[in-house]
Amino acid sequence: MNELKHAVVPIDLQSFCLEGTLALWVPALENDSEDDSEAIETADDNEKLFKKECVAYDAGVYTSNKSKGSQTLRWSIFQNRTLTIFDVSLNSKKEPLSKFNVKIHFPSNVMKDGVAFSFSEHSDTTIIYAITHARVLYYIRLSKTWFQLPDARLDDDWCLCYRPISFLNQKPDLMAAISTSEICVSFFNGGLTKIILNPKDASHYEQHIDDSSYLFSLKKYLSLQAFKADYRSPNTIISMIFLSTYNVLVMLSLDYKLKVLDLSTNQCVETIELSQTILPLQSFPYLTSDHTTNSFIALYYPDNSHGSFSIYKLNANAHSFKLNVVIEKGIIPPSLPDDEFIPWMLSDFQLISSEGSQSKFLLIIAWKSNLNTVIQKCNLSLDQDESFSCVWSHSLDSFSLIEKTFFDVPTNMSSGDISEIWLQHIFAHNTSIESIQVALLSFQNSSSQVSKNKLDKFGALTISELKNAVLSSIVSTIQIEPNSDLTGYDYYEYKRLLYNEWERFAKLVAYLDHFGDEILSINFDPSNAVTYINYANKVAFIRDPYLIESFDEEPLTKLISSLETDDPSLIEGYQILDLGRSLHSCMSFSTLSEIRYSLRELVQDLPSYSLFDTLWVFYDKHIYPNVDPDYISTLIDTLVSLENPMRDIDSLIQRLRSFDIYNHSAQSPSLFLCASVARVLDSILKKFQVSIEGFIFLLSLITSQQDYELQSKFAGCDKLFLSLLEDWRLVSFLLENSALLLEKFEEEDVDSTNCNLNTMEALASVNTALQFFSALNYSECFSESQISPLHATVISSLSAIFIRDDTENDLVTELVEKLFLFKQYNACMQLIGWLNSDPIAVYLKALIYLKSKEAVKAVRCFKTTSLVLYSHTSQFAVLREFQEIAEKYHHQNLLSCYYLHLSKKLFEESAYIDALEFSLLADASKETDDEDLSIAITHETLKTACAAGKFDAAHVALMVLSTTPLKKSCLLDFVNQLTKQGKINQLLNYSMPTLRQDVDNLLERKAFQMINVESQPCWYNILFSWRYKHQNYRDAAAIIYEKLSRYISTTELIGKKERTFIIEHYLIVLNTLELLPKEDTWILVTDMSVDKEPDPNFLPQKLLTLDAIVAEYHLQLKDVAVQVTAEMSSAMNIDL
């Protein structure tokens, strides 16, 4: 079970290779919406936000066995009322099929154990049943296309909601899906009902199943127990499973009875009386069946501190069913850690038949406490005499828990060393990044001294950014006052306070990350032979880990364990290595931290005196105080008994340095595996480091002993020590920097002068991310020109993770392209330094810079690419738009098409000036005449020029397009952009003789569409100015009169301000008409007194002469005079 740790994957990484999320909201039934006031009040509580958004309270895996193949869905329910579903099915290349995950939002919380699945072979859809706390049953059709298409079509009846009558009086408790239209629901206070749904007309009916084997008596009914608030009826079902092979429901009730219900007749056909336990039964999945044959049922029974289990075989004959006990066995207490006094509870258990066999089974049991999780398994074999043999094993799975033993502060350690050790201590474990972020937010909110680099929200940060934020926040909280004698600060007090703050933060991280350690369920996928361990925010895999090829055969473990069988001559060397590893295991974390700092000092500055003295001092300082003297004596006796230990150690080390960990196979690694390379590298390098340190510890022990026989057998160990020290230098350096595999590398780092000539030559030949990483750090590790054997092994072996086949390729480019298509722009930016100078790589750099709002770098990369890109259009999806443009214009003028494509890309990212530059380059680089291409380029120039505010260029492009069908849409963009940027005078000054009437019609349409004639920009005024400029005085006066008429008709109360507006506009109309000859002083305006016809395009009009308008003007003047007189009279009365 050690492979369990290596198969743990955080839930957020499951969406790493997805393009997006399909969010769905189910319709709410009456009173099915819960109050969100609590959520609003606690929105700023980081801890509750973390638990609500990142920690599930129910999870599982459902596999639908189809004739065309299986579909595996992993689902989780979070406290924000969201059901998240991942389609984790794989294709023949072990790559994920889905592109999207599905999030279904409910108006109220979904019940624990309130989700069930069924599959319809006819419609190829998965049915989801969900029951909420509001007692509403939801019937959801989950289509396979939802995981593959961004615009998946939803049928009107994709979700149906019901509230069965039995739900009104009783609280639902457990549910089992029988078919695509039938479910069985048990109730909290007893009872069972079968609900049959008819999705066609959204109807349903119930069949209540009576339990004739239990009769209530008046005495029991009137007992004192029945009046308790937490009373549950004895026939309450606390666990049930459905066996599809036999169409039966197996149930366990509170009255200690195991029952079999035949669903075809709704009759109980078998009942087994169980002995009462010392612990009360509660709602818990006590029952499980093998998912392959459906014939064997396992029952957990809490009859002692750890309980026991029984396995029953279901024998069916027509409608007769019989449960026969195959085995009854007590559970052996698992090996618990030091917290054995903390209560342990059973979390879940699962029975698995081995490849459909009816003689071999695997029983997996999950235990949990407040601090740890233990996975226990039992291998069961049914012998010919029908007796079972069991073999127990367990695995302590505390992968996300920071060690509880914290080190003491050494007196010779600086404050910087303390902070560095704590950073490594926190980030070295498989702690989720979200928990560290939330811990940092909580830490900053509780510390008033933190002011710099303060996080404002819960979001995505790179590891280096998060480390810097943690370091600056914790250091800034320490405030030390000067000593009383004013000689300086108390440095030792500063180190003590710094250590306390780091310890407080580490415990907070462990506390938050522990929320996700609870095991929610265990599921077996028989089609893929995978067992899923579902944690609250993680998922683990037993046997064949999902998406991680050969992870259960961890490379170095496989190497170490196979040395004896592969090469018998290495047996002695392996035994010596085992001694060194045992000596290494005696050291605590704080001791190892000090030892590694000492080794680092030795690497940086080798002593000028004897190496034997160095090893002796190393032993006295680090080994002797921390290891039992009796154990040291035992080690010495073992070493003396060896015949030729130096030869054995040298042979083993050479094997370690040259062993090919991964075979170069033709299997295609999944994208997820490439993303997990940092974890793989970290695991392998840690084991290398432990092995090397074990040998160094042994050498220091040997040189410190005054034993002639021992010294003679290890002659020449000083040279071996120097060799091991160099290996340790490389491994430690790569281990400390392995997190950089997904960190940001600046593009300029490739040309850094810090890299020597050998490094630059190595960079020229690399074609994988890991090789790039190793070559870039080459100058830090070695000063000699020849690469060491271990360094070559690290590069050749670990880089095989990235290699698709034996031929050279650039998988880094393909990886970055996939990340870009999946909209993982932050990850792309972190990998940008790994891209080489190929045209497609430079093009990808430009796209990444563009998405990161670094347009200057993007344009520089765009200009350095060439038309060689066109030969890659069929290989890379990011070039699909360029390919479509080139095909549209018959593969002519490729350079112009490419510049046009770049202009569109830059325009999409609001880089308008650069987009205009490339559109002009596209026009200038045309080699042959193509009218359609010219129109497309001119149109793009118009759009980009308008958006960039370069209206002179836009005006030129508009006049070119004045004779094309695009003129109306282009004119609309031109006018809108000018008015939006306040360039109205510039619009009026442009000469557009061929578009004069089009501009007039456009402005008139916009004027008539105005709701408030006083809003800005006022299209009435713009149209008046346009007509006035072109000496169209009659229509200019008419449009102002239209504005005036609409103003009067929509104004209810006319005061001083309104009178002024009316008088001013009448004067504008009259002054404009005065410019016309007397016989032409008339206008046509809309007649407001006539009701409009049904035809919206027809507007009744009337003719107004100058005299009529003057008469209206005089009436307005009289109204003004009356209003002024009334105001003066009122004022005089007040004075009197």
Curated annotation (Swiss-Prot):
<dbReference type="GO" id="GO:0017056">
    <property type="term" value="F:structural constituent of nuclear pore"/>
</dbReference>
<dbReference type="Pfam" id="PF11715">
    <property type="entry name" value="Beta-prop_Nup120_160"/>
</dbReference>
<dbReference type="InterPro" id="IPR048884">
    <property type="entry name" value="Nup120_helical"/>
</dbReference>
<dbReference type="GO" id="GO:0034399">
    <property type="term" value="C:nuclear periphery"/>
</dbReference>
<comment type="function">
    <text>Functions as a component of the nuclear pore complex (NPC). NPC components, collectively referred to as nucleoporins (NUPs), can play the role of both NPC structural components and of docking or interaction partners for transiently associated nuclear transport factors. Active directional transport is assured by both, a Phe-Gly (FG) repeat affinity gradient for these transport factors across the NPC and a transport cofactor concentration gradient across the nuclear envelope.</text>
</comment>
<protein>
    <recommendedName>
        <fullName>Nucleoporin nup120</fullName>
    </recommendedName>
</protein>
<dbReference type="InterPro" id="IPR021717">
    <property type="entry name" value="Nucleoporin_Nup160"/>
</dbReference>
<dbReference type="Pfam" id="PF21486">
    <property type="entry name" value="NUP120_helical"/>
</dbReference>
<dbReference type="GO" id="GO:0016973">
    <property type="term" value="P:poly(A)+ mRNA export from nucleus"/>
</dbReference>
<comment type="subunit">
    <text>Component of the npc107-120 complex which consists of nup85, nup107, nup120, nup131, nup132 and seh1. Interacts with nup107.</text>
</comment>
<dbReference type="GO" id="GO:0005635">
    <property type="term" value="C:nuclear envelope"/>
</dbReference>
<dbReference type="GO" id="GO:0005643">
    <property type="term" value="C:nuclear pore"/>
</dbReference>
<keyword id="KW-0813">Transport</keyword>
<dbReference type="InterPro" id="IPR056548">
    <property type="entry name" value="HEAT_Nup120"/>
</dbReference>
<keyword id="KW-0539">Nucleus</keyword>
<dbReference type="Pfam" id="PF23300">
    <property type="entry name" value="HEAT_Nup120"/>
</dbReference>
<dbReference type="GO" id="GO:0031080">
    <property type="term" value="C:nuclear pore outer ring"/>
</dbReference>
